[in-house]
Amino acid sequence: MSSISKAGIFIDVKQLLEFTYRMNKEMSIADRRDFGSQLIRYNLDMITAFTMAFHRRDERVAFEAGGKSYDIQLKGEKRFHVDALEAAFDSYQALMEFCFENLTFSRMSARKRRRRHKHFMELMAKIGTGIAKWSGSIYKQVVVSEK
């Protein structure tokens, strides 16, 4: 399993899965934007652990999040989700790179800052929607139990 401390910030996995599962049905575009902005705080290792588990066809995934250890039993057909998980992971990495490279607002003019912020929020909304789709399908097929 990948290093848990790499990301440095953790999120409660059960809460993430439940929240994103509901998001597809309940949230407006504006709410999805807010959710997208929270992705910066999400744990990269969680997505990595899921992706690796699906590739290896493991039946369990164990990792830490929110200061707790989780042991997740995967059910059903796992192969279906591999591409979606990889896409989510790639989107997250692209988002992080975008944040670090393009969101240095201190030296920008107000106009440029507004334009960058608008682009950033559109990107967040797209990624938030994508994450909701794959996590919703995973949530229906996993049993989450705290150790």
Q: Can you annotate each of these PLM segments?
A:
Residues 1-147:
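Amphipathic alpha-helical assembly/interaction segments
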